[in-house]
Amino acid sequence: MSRPSRRKLAYGGVAVATLAISCGTITPSSAAGQVLWTPSTSKGASSFASVQCASGNFKVVNDAAKGKVWRAYQAAGQERCETLSPDLKNGDTFYLGWSSKVDIKDANSRYVFQLKCDPSTDTANHPIEIDATDGRIRLQEWDTQHVSHTLWTAPTANGQWHSYALKIRLGRTDGTIDFWFDGKKQTFTTGSGTFKGTTWDGNRNYLKWGSYHPSSGDATNTFTSPVMATTLEAATAGS
């Protein structure tokens, strides 16, 4: 499958408060923005605060299109293979950028990205998530009553690389989400390019990449090192 063309993205600077980051790399600021966090494939899994995966199923691999990337392999019957990092701070605004391809061996969806909150009960659980099946990718927001709101969908297929970028302002009821897919700003099902709602809940929030939801078939999420940054340009430079 051909690699999607890379496009130069328009961006705007934004003031970003200090994030509770414990792992990964931080780079100095520049006119193009500051990278706040990104894991290193050279450093390996220790770049993340934790990895929730069966032994040997999360690793760095070489991809013909992207070079060194992360591979999260969720074997049939296993609940998840996910990374966890970094922790977030309510009220902050930041950009995220990465590329991913999936290989899902059944018809059930897997979460390939989560903005997760603790505790899981009596909260949104995962205020923002992207889930995939073989044929469809979807972005959803979950409110404080744990009710899902589909914001966007697009067709996809196993083995296709796609790029993702999010601008997130964290808030329990007044958070915002903007989204870019394969370099293009997306319009949500609401008709707007910015969604306002729940992007934070509970007492701890953090980011997860990988594959989640137990099922009868294997699933693999291969992804580039995610970048958290103060601008869209900085977050997507390596995607």
Label the predicted regions.
Residues M1-V16:
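N-terminal export and membrane-targeting signals
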